[in-house]
């Protein structure tokens, strides 16, 4: 009975596989939004204000960072919790595949969230005249919370690895 239970529990990790695959659909949606922004800029490129262009650029960087975060979570999560990725000897293989454990993935995700939050905060600051001061304060507090959380997770990871 114990063996059956353990095999069943071990096999249940495959439930995560379609979830990781589903994240690729979100990645596809981000790609659509990215190019939608590009196509909105092109007709107005000569009339758009520099500040607006910078804000749009920051939005595109934000989308790119979220996409990178998704790829990292999809591949590392799949490799850590479901099965090893077999991409073949002759094909390109990302150098970090198979080398990122759950702890380092957590730190990379935290660093990515801080980077995404930084871009978002920069967008808020660039548009500060249109945003209430109390809202800016909340954006700043949330960002500081992300930074402190990432630092704490990194520090805890460092002391537990010793």
Swiss-Prot record:
Record's subcellular location: Cell membrane
Keywords: Cell membrane, Membrane, Transmembrane, Transmembrane helix
GO cellular-component term (any): plasma membrane
InterPro entries the record matches: UPF0114, UPF0114_bac
Main location: membrane
Cysteine disulfide links: none
Transmembrane segments: 15-35, 53-73, 136-156
Membrane topology recorded in Swiss-Prot or TrEMBL: Multi-pass membrane protein
Taxonomy, superkingdom: Bacteria
PANTHER family, alphabetized: UPF0114 PROTEIN YQHA
Family membership noted in the UniProt record: Belongs to the UPF0114 family.
Name assigned to this protein: UPF0114 protein Sfri_3655
Source organism: Shewanella frigidimarina (strain NCIMB 400)
